[in-house]
């Protein structure tokens, strides 16, 4: 066979390219990424997915309340045997000076000579942990908790190369994960009339209302249970009134899912009605429910949302949901922020809002975040030693409690309520563990037989970002009973705002975790606020319901309780139906079809 010089040249180029390609494949095949949330057996470790937007991923948490939890285990298939370098992505969550979240890793029955979680560095990062010889292509890996005090591990990376530049930012980690785990760009879940993001009371009510009016609805929730703050994960019951509305029809769906009788941090989980709420949703033929799905990206056409992308926290696969109308019921305004919606954070100044109670200068103060807990009385005495990383209590300042109360909360402008959400949760841990250790150590006669039985690692927020609508509800509106033509949802709670407790500030300046409330008209101040607070002023097809609607910081104090947010959801569900009926935007519904909306709720 005869080849021309040109053919030979082309063949050489192809051969060289093939060698380069093989080289790249070899490099890739000589490394292994393990995401801990994909471990086959979690043991006593839990998947914590609250902080994906801040640190990049769900992770495993060893939340044992001071008692080491059972190992998490998985089997890993290596591309070849030999020596591998190891990196582990973790953090020291309480480096004061070094934290308690220590754990070890066991590979093929051999424990690494490296303790993780006590580096003295509070940031998430990759830690190089030496080398290991892999003799079996299929090898067992174990995470062994040493303390029961919230060790955490995000990912493990093995490489034949001694030097790796591993990403640590959210976007970089997502691309790295996609490449290493060979994840598809997305799986398409179809097009919906109405896409509701967030499965708290607002999201549930919005989805049910729209579905019962005939819309095809996707309800996307990033938790395994429905209910948000009122679920068994957070145990804050619903509050506010459902029978004093200007329009009595509003509140009927909220009454179906209500759990205000449960009380704060009830030990009986069934009181929070997780299963009942799930049953109601599953019985709605027009609702497709997607649990454990975290929305992290949107697709836009100008100022309209076309679709949202959500990551399944149990598989890390991405699913795409197209829609005509969207509702942000996330509480944190997550969907609104992703889409570029105008938003507010912290306290507005008196000059900005004209409110009598506003500060002279705007600031970042917000109401705080809480973690519920309780202890139970046992038959035997147990210890809970004071440790250096805990907040330190004294005879002069401690709290004799066996259960959480409403005013244990962290935030207040000392921490950013969203960006520092993991730090806030961990600060609550340090306060709760520290006070409990003081009681168990110095008041043993009274608390010796009590045992810390429950502390939620899921944190419940009161405030975060708020999206701006065509009307920004203010303190003046509520106090002066300003009557808007589109007044539609009645709040009965009164303006309830939380601030750092002054005595707590004296003992823990800048680290407050106790609040006091200003709530002069509790349950006595009815006010019906307008529909125009429930849609974005600059994103054409975005509704919102929940604590992230268009209100000032002060006005938020009146509308944030969960029966009220559920009623917002009902209105948004009706409005979404009318928008589909008339092929109009939420704003056009106000300008052109307001009377029909009011007729719907009458």
Locate predicted features.
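Bacterial Sec-dependent N-terminal signal peptides
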Residues: 1-30
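Extracytoplasmic
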Residues: 30-186
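Flavin (FAD/FMN)-binding glycine-rich loop and adjacent Rossmann-like elements that form
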Residues: 181-185, 229, 292, 304-307, ...
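Beta1/beta-strand and adjacent pyrophosphate-binding region of the FAD-binding site
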Residues: 188-200
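N-terminal Rossmann-fold NAD(P) dinucleotide-binding loop
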Residues: 203
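Conserved N-terminal/central alpha/beta ligand/cofactor-binding core
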Residues: 209, 215-216, 221-301, 344, ...
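Second-shell loop/turn segments in exported
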Residues: 195, 243, 261-267, 418-425, ...
